[in-house]
Amino acid sequence: MSRRGTAEEKTAKSDPIYRNRLVNMLVNRILKHGKKSLAYQIIYRAVKKIQQKTETNPLSVLRQAIRGVTPDIAVKARRVGGSTHQVPIEIGSTQGKALAIRWLLAASRKRPGRNMAFKLSSELVDAAKGSGDAIRKKEETHRMAEANRAFAHFR
């Protein structure tokens, strides 16, 4: 039996300008080689572009995009009797948001375009409208989970 106590769950900090945890999560995921100031620049430029494109509150567009891409269920590889099955599992809200952010950034990196801020803003606007690569990834994950529903008892 372990003598160590359980670790406290860390809460995500909020960013300096918008005081929003989602923006901070996005910054931490877009971060490369420790260049956090560049990550903040990219995010804030993307938010400005969203403001120009939609003429609505950019944070509500961001929230709507992340809510639209967040998966409810995913598949996890589980080895049972020599064969690997894709077992559908439910996803918690924090893990779902993290996955959604990862998918949004991956989809925006794939996009053709000038710079990351432009590509990210385009992907976020598309995701808020219900289209784009990140939404397609979510639907594909849900389809995989539905197809492998028979293996749900392997959890």
Swiss-Prot record:
GO molecular function annotations of the record: rRNA binding; structural constituent of ribosome
Alphabetized PROSITE patterns for the sequence: RIBOSOMAL_S7
CDD domains: uS7_Chloroplast
Localization per record: Plastid, Chloroplast
Database matches in InterPro entries: Ribosomal_uS7 (IPR000235), Ribosomal_uS7_bac/org-type (IPR005717), Ribosomal_uS7_CS (IPR020606), Ribosomal_uS7_dom (IPR023798), Ribosomal_uS7_dom_sf (IPR036823)
Subunit comment: Part of the 30S ribosomal subunit.
Record family assignment: Belongs to the universal ribosomal protein uS7 family.
Record-given protein name: Small ribosomal subunit protein uS7cz/uS7cy
